[in-house]
Amino acid sequence: MDSLRPADWPGESFCYTIRNQTDLKNERNPQMTHNENEFQGFFAEFFDMLHEGCEDAEQYVSLLGTYGKKILELGSGTGRIVIPLAKAGFQVTGIEFESDMISLMEKKDYPRDRLHVVQADARHFSLDERFDVILLSCNFLNHFADAADVASILSCCRDHLEPDGCVIIDSSVPDTDYMVRSNGEEEVLTFATENGSEIRDYFKPCYDFLNQVENDTIRLQEWKDGVLIREACTEERLTWYYPREIRSLVREAGLRVDWESSALCTKEDRPPISVDSENMIFCCKHT
């Protein structure tokens, strides 16, 4: 599961522009508007289109070759990481909670004998096998604000690791400057799709800095030829972890940090996590 936060959008998959809200027809049709989970329905489709072709999938393919062939990803979504891994020859299992995300993945072309997805809650999963690598990629942990939930997730990961296996946690370093600038401000982005329609994304983050919580209000509209085709609204709640917190959570789960870096790359090229880093990667093993 990834966030729909603008700072995380790659931009390669869509032609998009940022416009002021006053530049757009901010029309709403109450009969068409409905609330959705941020990983269901319209939002699941938007997520899938938005993250298609992200470069981190190929980075994982390159990185994981030295760690073994059995891979588990928590929050595998519509398959943007697990499918490239399966195509590269890895034996891959995904855990995904949302059925709409799984349905979108199953429509894609991938080797069925090397990838299967289990619909389950990552906080309490139990599989009858162990893995060489377990991935918590793309801000997966940020969707769990309760420390007890994170502890349960990491404990489940520990119990499903091979003796020399590793858990890889991939999260964004909190961008406090962006948070301060954007707090309470609605941003509107427009995306031109392949079928000639335009998706308008109205995104408003509100930050609770004391508790490191982000509450987002998101509204999606799809327009074609000046007509509003569909509209959906959602709210998401995220939390943001700093490196010291990740290290502590890992240690409390009975794991240790084997290495950490600000980029997904081989040992020789790993840059350290610093104040200028956008990402933080932790490779964790049994104690």
Residues of each region from the PLM?
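A short SAM/SAH-binding and catalytic strip from SAM-dependent methyltransferases
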Residues: D132-A148
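C-terminal lobe and adjacent flexible extensions of AdoMet/dcAdoMet transferase-like proteins
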Residues: R237-T287
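A short glycine-rich, Lys/Arg-flanked "PGG" loop and its adjoining helix->strand segment in the class I
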Residues: A151-P163
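A short acidic, Gly/Pro-enriched loop at the edge of an enzyme's catalytic core
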Residues: R123-V133
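Class I SAM-dependent methyltransferase "Motif I" SAM/SAH-binding loop
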Residues: G75-G77
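SAM-dependent methyltransferase
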Residues: I168-R247
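Class I SAM-dependent methyltransferase SAM/SAH-binding core
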Residues: R80-H124
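Conserved class I S-adenosyl-L-methionine
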Residues: N26-K69
